[in-house]
Amino acid sequence: MSLLPNRRVLTILLLVLLPSSALAQRAVFVVRHAEKASDSNDPPVPLSAAGSERARRLASLLRDAGVSAIYSTDTVRTRETAAPLAKLLRLETRLYSATGSDGKVDAAPLARRIASENSADVVLVVGHSNTIAPLLSALGAKETVEIGGGDYDNLFLLIPRPSGPPLLLRMHF
């Protein structure tokens, strides 16, 4: 049995699990950028051929999920990961900084921005291995998430609930 979610399963999950309250996002998808062409982190680092293919699969997977906003850090690899879905949905990718003025990862500003700009939307955030866990935590997830250096296939779905912490689903694509 494959762990790969298909669009029909994802659509059913969204319809069944999404809250109708306008007090929070309907859902937030969070992914790490797809495979990069180099092991270097010095910009600009584009996606590899495998990474470009994964970005296209992500677009195919989320095309019917109701995504109405896409956020990405301002690196080539994250923007290239977001690009196929943004193009398909005719959305402009919104850039965000994953670090505070001290250079350390700070996800709280993005969490506040998502809440204020997209109160009733389904959102996709494309980040990095070191920014995903802090973002999920800033969005209220209680589970501890670790992303390995070679892990590019995680797709997190955070669904707010009327009370208590949000539901966090971890899938692979």
Predicted feature residues:
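Hydrophobic alpha-helical segments, principally membrane-spanning helices and signal/leader peptides
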Residues: 4-5, 17-18, 75, 113
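Bacterial N-terminal signal peptides
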Residues: 11-20
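Active-site-proximal alpha-helix that buttresses catalytic centers in soluble enzyme cores
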Residues: 25-120, 132-134, 138-173
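Conserved beta-strand position immediately N-terminal to the Walker
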Residues: 123
